[in-house]
Amino acid sequence: MKFVRPVSVIHTAHNLKGGLQLAEFAGRLCYKSEGKIEPGSYVKFLLMLIDKGHTSILEHCPIYICGYHDMMSIEMINIRHSAFSRFVSDIKYARPDSHFYYIYTNLRVVYNENPELAKALIQTSTMEGDEIWKAHGVAWFVPKFDHPFARMSAYITTLRSVVDELVRERVQSDAVESTRWCDYSNEGRFDSISFCLPHWVKDSTFNACFKRFLKDVEAIEKNEDKIQRLYDLEDIAFCLYQNDINIANKRAYHYIRCCIMDEIFYNEAKDELDLPAQDAREYLFLGIKSEMYYTGFNKEWDNIIDKRLYDKYGKAHPNMHITMQQCKDHLDVIRTSQKAITDSDHGGESESAGD
C-alpha cells in the first residue's frame, strides 16, 4: 500500500494544441495511461474517444475565438449562443456597424455543432488552427487568465469522498480516475492500493507512526505469500494501536491498520474469490487515492471556492477545504502572474481576427 497527501495543480492553455494536450491528459487520467503520452499522441487518442462516443473529454480543451458577427458562419454563431459558451461583445473603431465578439467555449461545443470541424481542429498542424477558423469568419485569441470566462483545469489528487462531492458541481467538466478498470492487484503497474491521508491524520504524527511501523516490519521474516504478508502487517499495526495511549498516535495506527485490511479484502476478492477488478472494487473504501481533472470558467471556479472553501451555503468538509485552498492558491498565482499580452480586456488577438 501507499500513502499520499492531497495535492491540486492548475493547468491552462492559451493555444489550441495546448488545449488538446490537456484533453488527452484528462482522458488518460481516467484509466491511468498517462505513460503513453508522447508528442502528437493526442490526435489518435482523441479521435479514438470520439469514435467510442466519449466526447465529454473534449470539454477540457478550451476554445477562444473572436470575430465580427456579420462575418461568422452559422456554426460560429450557434457555438456563441451555446449554454456551455460565454461571450463578450465589443465595438471596433474600424467597423462600428458590426459587433465584434470574443467567444469562450470548449471543443465539445464545437463537436456538437459540427463533428467534422472538431476532428479537423484535432488534426491541424498549426498551433491554433488558423486557416480552419478563418474559413468560419473567426480567429483565435489569447485570453487573459484572470478574465471571468477564461477556462482553468485542476489536476486534483484527493480522497474518493471528496471526488464524489465535486462531481455534483456539474457546471464544471470532470474526468475521474476509474476504479472499475484499474486493477490495483497488478503489481507491475499499480504496485498496490494508494490511500490519501485525511485531514485528521496530521503529517508529523503519521510520519512518526509510519516510521515506527516500518521499523517493526523490518524486524519480522518476510512472508512470500502476498495476502499472508498483509495479515502480518495488520498484526503489527494492531499491536502498535493497542499499546499506544496517545490518541493522535492511536488514530494513525488505526488508519494504517484499516488501509491494510482494505488491501487484504481487495486482494482476497481478486485472488481467492476470482472476482474481476470491476467487482472487487466494491471492497475499496472512500479513503482511497483518487485523481480527477476538473475544468471550468474562472467565474464558476470562484463560485465553487465560495461554497467549498468559504462555506457560503453551509460548512464544507475539512478534506474539501484542503483541496479547494490548494486550487485557490494556484489560481491566484496564475491569474496574477500572466504578463499582459495586449491592452485589450480580453487578451491577444490574431492578426486575422478582423479580416
Question: What do these predicted regions represent?
Answer:
Residues 1-355:
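Family-specific signature for flavin-dependent thymidylate synthase
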